[in-house]
A protein has these predicted regions:
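Long, amphipathic alpha-helical coiled-coil segments characteristic
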Residues: 1-44, 54, 126-135
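Short, well-ordered alpha-helical segments
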Residues: 36-41, 54-72, 84-98
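Secondary-structure edge/capping motif, primarily at the C-terminal ends of alpha-helices
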Residues: 21-33, 52-55, 71-81, 99-110, ...
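Structural secondary-structure packing elements that flank or coincide with functional cores
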Residues: 1-8, 78-135
Length: 135
């Protein structure tokens, strides 16, 4: 398998994890679940953070997913249930999806979008949450 094909496969794997996160969030919003399992979210962000290991283009995705993992980290019984918490996780899923899709376009030789502002805003938000949690 070529390096490009491997990277595209890793993008697909990470996008599947983002999709699972979005499905869990949607179920919580519709009231089908009382909240979202923090352990499940953290594991999914962990998988995304380790996608594309060794491929330099994945660095922004890995960094943001690792921050999101820290924000959502909790025991398997710990539930994410406030609207603010759910909104932050949705923001992370949206930006990671945008970054992953943009990487896929670039690997296929298409022009990518400028995703830097979205990534910077998410990084700032996640870092702020981590700092607030330490107080």
């Amino acid at each position: 398998m070529s390096a490009r094909a491997h990277a595209l496969d890793q993008i697909d794997t990470a996008l599947a994890e983002v999709g699972a996160i979005e499905t869990s969030l949607a179920a919580a919003r519709r009231g089908q679940n009382p909240g979202v399992n923090r352990g499940d979210l953290a594991r999914r962000f962990h998988t995304i953070a380790h996608a594309g290991t060794g491929h330099h283009a994945f660095a922004p995705v890995q960094e943001l997913a690792a921050l999101a993992e820290k924000v959502t980290d909790g025991t398997d019984q710990s539930i994410l249930h406030t609207a603010g918490e759910i909104e932050v996780v949705q923001h992370a899923a949206d930006v990671l999806s945008l970054l992953l899709r943009d990487m896929g376009h670039q690997l296929l030789g298409r022009r990518g979008a400028d995703v830097t502002p979205a990534a910077a805003a998410l990084r700032e938000r996640l870092e702020h949450m981590l700092m607030a949690g330490r107080r």
